[in-house]
Amino acid sequence: MSLPPGFLDELRSRLSLTQVVGRKVSWDLRKSNQGKGDMWAPCPFHQEKSASFHVDDRKGFYYCFGCHAKGDVITFVKETENVGFIEAVEILAREAGMPMPQRTAGEQERADLRSGLVEVMEASVRFYRLQLAGGAGAAARDYLDRRGLDMAGRERFGIGYAPDSRTALWSHLTGAGVAPQRIVEAGLAIAPDDGGTPYDRFRGRIMFPIRDARGRCIAFGGRALDPNARAKYLNSPETPLFDKGRTLYNIGPAREAAGKGNTLLVAEGYMDVIALSEAGFAAAVAPLGTAVTEDQLRLLWRIADEPVVALDGDKAGIRAALRVVDLALPLLEAGKSLRFALLPEGRDPDDLIRAEGRSAMQRVIDRAEPMVSLLWRRETEGHVFDSPERRAALDKRLREVLRTIRDPSLRRHYGEEIARLRQDLFGRGSA
């Protein structure tokens, strides 16, 4: 969408950057000068206690002296709401009382589609929640009771239940006047190849709304109650609203909690996030049925400098952690990394918290390992280096790993740390 000359300048002039930013931060009034529009606060983009985030209201720019985030009011809305440029402009234009320039027919059609799909998704959230509260949801309520999730927690996360019926949601939505094609486009129903009546995608499942950073339901995750179900967990397909590789479960509340100093945690699934949040670890997120992607990593780093990935300490958990390490290495920048909190084997966060309490989970987080430790473990554990050839093979593998780090300074520091670990393994006399 093209914007006419002067529109963005007019938009920026109508809005106070401190007013927009002030909804996301707590100003340090001792350090700030309100009269001059010179404001300071703890940064909303990374975890800190000091006020290193500076807003110059007169110039209309912000800059963080800690993580180096910078930009204007549009950039701020883009980053804090996790939206694109045009959507950020639309948000601010509504606030400023400025009509958006006329869209092309195609742009208007896409915007109307997204708006309509959000309405369908929110109607589905309400339907699923009613089903959980009714007779059909008895088994689902029992499961949630066994998992220790009380009514307040269910309300907080909007959890519902999809009845074990092919057309329960379909009949409800079409009966309420929703266009059949919209239900299919939202990923809530599947249209048969033979042209018959579409049927509900989610059946006999506990339903977890997946919301974007602005709190809008854009997808669902469903947990099967039937132990013999083909898929224990089922996510919405990708739609005009939902790109699973660019979204994280619980992203909105987690971003807010991380901005208040809570450690940003990356768990494996919905129930892990909910268990962590209910235990007071409010800045918890999870990927959506896939391994962590580059886009998700960049999103995590916009929230915190060093997110902690919490995984099972068994072999599968270690393999998953190493896949994240391999993905992250080429993307690393100074000050941006990951740590890994490996839980006791066979335990997920919910198991650990219920068995040993919140303090046990906190100890696991406090012992989180840096990426280089996992790399070293992968290359050395279970190996015997009793010959020059085996040691040379290790050196070759480590050089290959180091070459994937693009940042020269980080590559040098990783090399120094690996050299230190190598000396500890082989003795100071080795070269």
What name fits each language-model region?
Residues 1-108, 163-164, 170, 420:
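N-terminal structured subdomain of primase-like DNA metabolism proteins
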Residues 9, 13, 79-96, 204-224, ...:
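Structured, non-catalytic alpha/beta "coupling" segments that mediate domain-domain communication
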Residues 43, 64, 77, 144, ...:
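Terminal peptide-recognition signature
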Residues 3, 15, 21, 34, ...:
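Phosphate-handling DNA/RNA-contact segment within nucleic-acid enzymes
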Residues 212-213, 255-264, 291-307, 311-431:
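A charged alpha-helical hairpin associated with nucleic-acid processing machineries
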Residues 11-14, 33-36, 107-118, 134-138, ...:
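Conserved phosphate/pyrophosphate-binding and hydrolysis machinery centered on Walker-type P-loop NTPases
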